[in-house]
Amino acid sequence: MRIETKVEKFNEHLYLESGRLLEGFEIIYETYGQLNEDKSNVIVICHALSGSHHAAGRYADEVKAGWWDKFIGDGKAIDTTKYFVICSNNIGSSYGSTNPMSIDPSTKKEYRLKFPVLAISDIVKAQMKLYKRLGISNAVAVIGGRMGGMQALCYAIEHPT
């Protein structure tokens, strides 16, 4: 299974449900499998509150595999020989995307307790900006457990395609 980890940096504002904004943000994400030419084989995986973008596979220096490794991979339920699977780290998470320990561009200091409160729709909005940048306009499925399931529901309501 082909695994790639990448980071996308966004310089635009992300307007949040709370009325606050992030003045730019970063999203780290992993992909599994190969995106086909017309980008019609995408499956989006959304992680739980304590999860990360590392949903499957194992790196040489890791003791355990990604949190859904039993389900994602060549010949598995989410078959990476057929589908291009993408799992982005939620903004606000401590696993590489913009979070309370990130630098606030307006103060040049870590956000810490000044990091804005996020709604599920804020996380989805940030992810949609990532998919737009990658040229992905729809997905075969959006799947997630626990908080990831809440994100999947938000996609179904706010972005049904």
State each model region's role.
Residues 44-45, 87, 141-143, 154:
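A structural signal for short, well-ordered beta-strand segments and their strand-loop junctions
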Residues 97-117:
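Short acidic, low-complexity segments enriched in Ser/Thr/Gly/Pro
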Residues 146:
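Catalytic nucleophile serine of serine hydrolases
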Residues 30, 34, 40-102:
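N-terminal cap/lid subdomain of alpha/beta-hydrolase-fold enzymes
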